[in-house]
UniProtKB/Swiss-Prot annotation:
Binding positions (Ca(2+)): E80, N95, D96
Keyword Coiled coil: no
Residues covered by the C-type lectin domain: 33-108
GO molecular function: carbohydrate binding; metal ion binding; toxin activity
Domain of life: Eukaryota
Species classification: Eukaryota, Metazoa, Chordata, Craniata, Vertebrata
Record's function text: Mannose-binding lectin which recognizes specific carbohydrate structures and agglutinates a variety of animal cells by binding to cell-surface glycoproteins and glycolipids. May be a calcium-dependent lectin.
Stated name of the protein: C-type lectin lectoxin-Enh2
Signal peptide limits: 1-23
Disulfide bonds: C26-C37, C82-C99
Family of this protein: Belongs to the true venom lectin family.
Motif Mannose-binding: positions: 72-74
Compartments it resides in: Secreted
InterPro entries xrefs: C-type_lectin-like, C-type_lectin-like/link_sf, C-type_lectin/snaclec_domain, C-type_lectin_CS, CTDL_fold
Amino acid sequence: MGQFTVVSLGLLAMFLSLSGAKGDNCPASWISRNGVCNKLFPDRKTWLEAEKRTWKWSDRTSTNYFSWNQGEPNNVQDNENCVHLWAPSGYLKWNDEPCASLHPFICQYKL
């Protein structure tokens, strides 16, 4: 198996948009799309729990893509150091929030 990248998402809709054909190389219950395997884990975890030991992207590149909701990140009470996809934006925009917040998450790895 390749390195895992954990993406904390607060949504099921994003997972459903990944509904490509099931690949022969992905484990059962995983979905294959564009050369990667994806799986939604509905149990809720904090950002730190969900991405433990997988903090960096699997290819070690930094992101140059940002999709903050208007007025974000605002770091309310100097306690919002993690990000999730914001439901009121249709899960298209990011919102910063405390890292102890619980959300479903998706794991992904390259085939």
